Structures are given as structure tokens and as C-alpha cells.
Amino acid sequence: MADTIKHTPMMQQYLAVKADYPNQLLFYRMGDFYELFYEDAVKASELLEITLTARGKSGGNPIPMAGIPHHSAEGYLAKLVKLGQSVAICEQIGDPSISKGPVERKVVRVITPGTLVEDALLEDKSENLLAAIFQQADEYGLATLDVASGRFEATLLPDSTQLSAEVERLKPAEIILPDDPLFKQNLPESIQNRPGLVDYPSWHFEKDSCRKRLIDHFGTQDLVAFGCDQLPAVISAAGVILHYAQSMLQNTLAHVFSLQTYQADDALALDAMSRRNLELDTNLTGGKNHTLFAILDNATTAMGSRLMNRWLNQPLRNRDIINDRFNAIEDIIEQHSQEEFRSALKPIGDLERILSRVSLYSARPRDILHLGRSLNQLPELQALLKQQTANKWQQLSKQLGLYPELASQLETALVESPPMLMRDGGVFAEGYDSELDELRNLKNQAGDYLLALEAREKERTGITTLKVGYNRVHGYYIEVSKLQSDNVPADYVRRQTLKAQERYITPELKEFEDKVLSANEKALAREKWLYQQLLERLNQDLQALQRTAAALAETDVLVSLARQAINLNLTRPTLSSEPGIDIKQGRHLTVEALSNQPFIPNDTCFDEQRRLQIITGPNMGGKSTFMRQTALIAIMAYMGSFVPAESATLGPIDRIFTRIGASDDLTSGRSTFMVEMTETANILHHASPESLILMDEVGRGTSTFDGLALAWAIAEQMAQSIQGYCLFATHYFELTTLVEQFNNTVNIHLSAIEHQDKIVFMHQVEEGPASQSYGLQVAALAGVPTAVIDKAKKHLHRLENQTAAQQQTSGTASSAKESVQQFDLFAQPALPEAIETMLTDLKALSVDDLTPRQALEKLYEVTNTVKNASE
């Protein structure tokens, strides 16, 4: 920007502040507006669709300017944050009445996508995470902080693949990275292409300074208790995230009182593509409808919904924790107490986020009202918890806590319907503070005084139309008509002239005005002081209240899962230490919810003889639905939910992989087939015998022979080397012969019936390969013109006749079943007879007994034989 010497004092102040926040939009408070100047104004006018104007000239040039009213700033901020922008809020902190020159201003808050705490800027059912990544050797430290709840976590990841998967699970709104271009280039593309990346000075990641920052914040001697004392990459990531959040919020973040270091392999792993394919909480079009989360989430509170989402996206492998959840759900169902719990949970507010704002001293009066109502519900919830018998309920009962004194204070402190903001006053109830009551009484008695004054003045002046009134601009006044203005007493001082009236003030009315206005100011100041005291009181119990909030959220999730277990006819699964998966009459909840027809349930069975299952059958027959429902049932079981099946027993599962569907990745310049092969390569490199693997139509993105060759080799790798639980759907019928090669492979198919040239999908999984693909019938259902279908039938008939003739010639058509199969791609072609004879002669040849001339003659003979055979 231009040299500040050329600018007015106010613009010099603006430019000095802006220099410290070059990457943020600067909201610069001027009276009742936030103003933006220069490039910020141009950018904001485009993003917010507000008017771009100019504020005179400074330095000889017009200054672009745009502004928004401060009272409606939150709506504009929400829009900017959704667009990935960061905003620095610069407030007036000086008193304009005593300022010489520009009023003193200061940036009090920087709003970034990952540091939101304001209720209007957050989504109720989604976490809003700030993340930081740091690399040490080949390992990555990843830390996340939910500023709005205080949850602080970190983990060490062994490679970039697991880093990518974990970032996809967490979906952070903002990621802090060292400002080293090489570091960013070495990150997975999935992270490089994410919005919200922040380049932060690399020196902030220095391990020793980060360690000290964390130790100082938590008030400990080391980081042993947090499980990361010997993890330098984790320490750097966690230290940076704390520094960044404190800087943006201009706060110490006292509500962040712990750091949890976790192992990524404690949870059932899903890569980014698997999460998308299975539509856990986001559908394939990016929406939230028709997902598993939308089906399962019946939570009463917002924090319960967020915890439900976390459980769904992070299914645990610890069977003890999961069985505790099963027991709690079963207990509440048996005692029929889910509706009582829901009724008791209804008044509970979003305590996690309210308490964070309490800690930051940004809580609004209605936050405190909801907190008070929530505390009043705790005795009822405590009684319900104690009626349950499962261990989990007893643990939650102890964690819940009761706060009778605090609840009573909050109940008596606030009016029944407080204003949105503390600045408006009128927050505290009558009787809470005697000094405030006295100041308010003075204002409340003003009406009686003014009526008495009006009556006295009418009598004194003889002006019967005289009125006493008040407005915010001119204060109290005595109003008479212009016709009567000549009759006013000498002590009447003109205050305002209107078209038909004159307004006056008297010494008595002025004295009263000063007293009332002073009382109003003092009352508002008293309320602000009382509010500050109330927040300080709440902060004394902050950690205990946060534990209470966590207990309420978990209670809500378990009650919700119990309710949905009844509503959706779910069954308690069994988690076994023995390998295998046995699901009886499993269902796909989302498809079932959307369908007007009864859902056809199916069994899934994996054991040592059924590790690889080749699935054939027509398109639209239900192969993908069957595969997805198997994975979704596994995820539900490992998150601690009952499952849609008559029964389900699941052995250990470490990962779920899906290779279902694909499209071009235009941003990275990758074709559909390249995307498919990249996903397949990831599976082949990382799958284990405990992995559940779904592979749909592998190889279809290239030529028939290339695709078949790849599909065959990949299926062989699954059966022979990986030996995971693999559902392998294909239209390559040749793969059904793998059952003859491997004793852990079986064929299954989705049945269909053809009737009068039409196909009826049975959606039933049956043993053995499909008899045909029904491709033409599906095409007809899709509306392909009849003329095209008729031509296709002729071509199909011709191709089948050619295949049958070739098989009869080669002697391979030993049965009617074999005659309709395609050729074995991997059969060795027959050699010409002359070559076979030559090879036999060469095998019998004793090279050591040949003279040089005989050897040369033999070489000529071999050469001629090969040439003749190839012609």
C-alpha cells in the first residue's frame, strides 16, 4: 500500500493495523459500521454482494470502501467463513469523547474457518476442527482442536496414506502447515487440494518451543501424562495448533485442559474413497440426506448428534468398550426407559459449546439461560441413570455430577427471556441484586414523575395541550404548539423546533433527566459487572461442567441408538475373537428407508473356505447394495450400534476397503481407469487377512482383455496372498473358474428371472455363478430404443454361434454349460507342428559333440524352420 505519510490520521491508523493482518479481511469499526478499504473492500463487495463506494481521497486517490452494520455482522461473517475467508475484527476501544485524533482501535479477534466459537457461524451437528500437520523422518504428527468444545487430540501416523485417511475422517475446516513449499508438495494430493490450508512460519514448529508451550499451558513438568512425551512430530503439531488458536482468539483457551494422544489403529480404518462410497455422513452428491448418519441420528441434543457422528466415523476395535455400549443399549430397551430419557434430555442445551464461550468470556445471556435450564435437569437424569443396571450407565451417573447451588443461582439470576446481547441490558431478574434494583426503580418511577410534572405545568402555564415526552436523540422535553409558544414561562429553554410544535426543557426536567440517564448508565454498568462475576463463577467449575457435558452427550447417543434399534428392528451383534463374518438376513438401512417395496434381506458368510466370493449377476440386480450393506453392518457393529440383521457375528476387522464406482478426477488429470487402478493399488498394498474388501467391476475401464487380465490377477492375489474377507463383483464370467484353483473361493450370484423377454430382479443372493448377465434386458428397462435392442440380439446370437464353433473346433466344448462360457484367456496357444518337431530334436541334441561346421548348419536349419512356420 502507499506510504502512510500521504494519508489522513485515520487512514494511517487503518494501514498500520492492516499491515499486521495482510491475509485477512479487516473489519474496521467506525461507529455503527464495520468498514473495509482498498483491496478488502473490492473483495468483500464481490463475495457479499454489497455496494462498493469510495471514502473521499487519501494520498490523492479515491479510497475503495464497503461497509456492513455491526449489529448484522454475524450473517456476513458466516457467509465469508463458508467461502473460506478469514476476518480480523478491529474494534474501537478508546472513548471518542476524550480522544485527540483517531479513536484508539485494536484487533480483538481473528475469525478463521477452524477457530469458530460463535453459535451463528457453526453447524449444530458437525464438529469444526482446526488441524496441524508436521513431518519427522517418514512419520507425520497430526493434531486437531475443536475450539468450540475444547477437545484436543493428536496422533502419530506412519505414512502419507494413513495421514490422508485420517484427515478425510476428521474433515478439518483449516489445516496449519509449515510454510515450506517442499513440505506441501510431499503431502498427498487429497490434502494439497483441500480448502483451508494455512502456511505458518516454520520456526513455530520447533520442537522445544512447542514442548514448552504445551507444558506451560497445562501446568505440568512434562508431557508423559498425555502420551506424547517421546513423539516430537506430535509435539510440534500440537504446540503449533495451540499457539495459532490462542493468537486468533486473543485468549489463553483455559477450556482446553487436556491433550489426548490416540493410536489410529485403535479404530477400524477406512480410506477416503471408502467413506465416500459407503455414504456414512455425506452422500455421493455432497449432501447430508440419505446417509447412514441421517438414518441413525435420533439424538435429542446437538452435542449428542456430533458424538454420534464421531462414533460412526471412528468405529473402535476394542471389544470391551463396544460391548459396554451394547449392554447399555440392551438395558435401556429391556427397561423401556428410552422415552423417559428423551423427555429429560429435551431441555438440555449445547453445553459443550456454551461452556467454551463461558471460558472465552463471549457467552451471551441466552447461553447462560440454557446452561441454567440444563443444570436443573441433572437430578432427573441422575435418577434415571441410577435405575439402569449396565456398567456404562453407572459410569455416566458418576461422571454427570450435580450443581444445586449453581443451578439455583442461574435460575434466579436471569429474566425469563433475556435479550440477545449483554450490551442491551435487561438481563438480570428483579431481586437478584439490590443495587441494580434501586437504579432500575429510579427509571421505573420516571413515568409517574413525568405525569405529575405534566399536570403541574399545565396548571402553571394554562396550556392544556402541553405534553411531556422523551426521545433518544434529544432526551426529555415539554412540547407545546407554536400557537401557544408565546405563553411559555421564562424558565422554558427551547430544545427543538418542529413544523407545528416547539419543545422545551426546564431546570427541573434537566435535573431529572441527568439523574435518570445516570441511573440507566449505572444500571447497565452494574449489569455488565454482574455478568462478568457470573462468568467467573462458572469458570470455577469449568472442567467439572465439561465432564458433565461429555456424560450428557454419551447418554444421548446411547438413548438414540436404543430408540433406533426398536424403530428399525435392529439386533445386538456378537463380536468374536475368531476370524469370520456371519450375517443372517442382513439389510441396507438407507436403501430400505428409500424403497417403496419390501427390502429383500440376504446372508453374508465368510469363513476359511469362503474368503474370496466372486459375485456375478445382472446390473441392477443388487450386487452393490449387498456389498455395501455388509460393510455398513460391520461399521455399525464396531461403533457400538445394533445392526439390521436377524443375527450377526463378526470376527476381528482392521480395515474396510471399497472399490465401487469411479469417475474422472479432472482436477488431477486422472482418467476413470487411473482412479480405479490407484484405489486398487492402495488395497493391494494395505489389505490384510482381517480386512473387509469390496471390489466392484475391477478392470472395466480398459479394453476387454486388459481388464480381464487385471481382474483375474487381482482376484488371484486376494485369494492367494491377502486372504481377506473379499466380495468381488464382476461381469467377467471367466473368474468363476477360480473356485477350481483356490479352496478359499466360492461363487455367489444375485438371482433374476426372465419372463417374456423381460427381467425380474429377485435381489436374492444364491450360491454358484449366474447363468447369464441379462444385459439386453436391463438396456430395454433403461429405455434403449427397440430397434437397437433387436440389432443387439442379432449381434449376440452371431457372437454366441462363433464362440460355440471355435470351442467345438478346439475340442473344449465338453458340455452345454461350457459352450456358453467365454474362452480361457490364459490358456497357452498351440505351437505349429514343425516347431514342436524342432524343439524335440533340439532337446535330444548333444551340443558338445558338434563340430563348428555342424553347429552352424544346425543354426541355419533352426532359422529356416522358424521363418517357414511364421509365414
UniProtKB/Swiss-Prot annotation:
InterPro entries: DNA_mismatch_repair_MutS (IPR005748), DNA_mismatch_repair_MutS-lik_N (IPR007695), DNA_mismatch_repair_MutS/MSH (IPR017261), DNA_mismatch_repair_MutS_C (IPR000432), DNA_mismatch_repair_MutS_clamp (IPR007861), DNA_mismatch_repair_MutS_core (IPR007696), DNA_mismatch_repair_MutS_N (IPR016151), DNA_mismatch_repair_MutS_sf (IPR036187). Pfam families: MutS_I, MutS_II, MutS_III, MutS_IV, MutS_V. SMART domains: MUTSac, MUTSd. GO terms for biological process: mismatch repair. Keywords: ATP-binding, DNA damage, DNA repair, DNA-binding, Nucleotide-binding. CDD domains: ABC_MutS1. SUPFAM superfamilies: DNA repair protein MutS, domain I (SSF55271), DNA repair protein MutS, domain II (SSF53150), DNA repair protein MutS, domain III (SSF48334), P-loop containing nucleoside triphosphate hydrolases (SSF52540). ATP binds at residues 617-624. GO terms for molecular function: ATP binding; ATP-dependent DNA damage sensor activity; damaged DNA binding; mismatched DNA binding. Belongs to the DNA mismatch repair MutS family. This protein is involved in the repair of mismatches in DNA. It is possible that it carries out the mismatch recognition step. This protein has a weak ATPase activity. This is DNA mismatch repair protein MutS. It comes from Hydrogenovibrio crunogenus (strain DSM 25203 / XCL-2) (Thiomicrospira crunogena). The gene is mutS.
